[in-house]
Amino acid sequence: KILAKHHPMPVLVVSSLTEDGSETAMQCMEAGASEVLSKPDGSMSVGALSAQLAHHVKAVYAAGRREKALTAQPHNTNVHVATSSKTLNKHGDDKQHAVSTVGRTSEVRITSKLNDKRLLVIGSSTGGVKALTCVIPSLPKNCPPTVVVQHIPSHFSKVLAQRLNDMSQVNVREAEDGEVLTEGVCLIAPGGFHIAVLNTPKGYQVRLTQTPPIHFCRPAVDVLFTSAAKAAGSQTTAVLLTGMGSDGAQGMLNVMTAGGDTIAEDESTCIVYGMPRAAGLLNAVKTKLPLPHIAHGIAKSLNQLEVY
C-alpha cells in the first residue's frame, strides 16, 4: 500500500501456498500488485520455473507501463470513475467495498426465463482480480450459471472465490469436478486445473483436468470458452477482460462461430490490453466496453438471447 501510494511501480508477489500466504497475496493484489506467483516446490524443473517466472515478469512490466499511461491520460468523461461502490449482497448487507480504479454504475437487471440454457463465461489475467471485483458483485442473484477463469496459482483461487462471494449477490465458490451449474452460482476455476463445461442430461456440468498448460496457463481461458461454445452454442455470452497474451482469443472466436455473444474490455480501462486485443485481431469481439459498463453489457447480452 505504501509503495502504491508514494512510489508506484510494478509489483510481482511471490507467496507460499498456505492459507495465510494466499490471503496476504490477495490483499497485495487488491492494494495494487499486478501478479502473484506461488513459491515453487521441489518437483518443478529449473527450465519450467524460468519460463514461468519470465512470463510473469513480462506481464508485470506490461502492467506497470500501462498503468503509467492511464495515469497520464486526461479523464474520459464517458467513463464513470469512483473509489468505492455500495452493493446489497446476498446477506442483505449494504456493504461498501473498494474498487480502486473504476466503479459500478446503476443496478444491473437480468430477466429470468423458463427452460433457461444461457451460460456466462468470463476470462481474465493480469489486472483481472481488480476487474472481477468490479464485474461479479454487480451481477444479480438470478444471473445464469457463470464460470470464471482467472490466471492464478493453485490455492489462491479459493481465496479469490471467498472474497468475491463476500461482496456479491450471486454465490461464488471454487469449482469442483462434476458440479452441475445452476442459476445464481458463479464458479471460479481452481488454480492448476483447466475447466470445461459439458452439456449433459443433468444440465451444464463442470469438468476439471490437468492436461498440459496452454499459453503457459492452467487454467486457460481458451479451454473454457471453447467448451462453452460446444456445450451452449448460441446461448453463450463470453467476456474477456484485461490480461497479457492471447489466451481466450481463439475460444472467443469459437463462441462467435457457434452463434454466441462476445464482449471484450475496452483498451481505455485494461491494465494490460493483450487478451482483448488478440480477440479483436481475430474479429471475435462483438462489443467493446470499458470496465464500469461490462456488467450492463452482460445483462443486455443475456436478456437478448433467445431461449429454445
Positions of PLM-derived features:
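Conserved acid/base catalytic micro-environments in cytosolic active-site loops
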Residues: 1-308
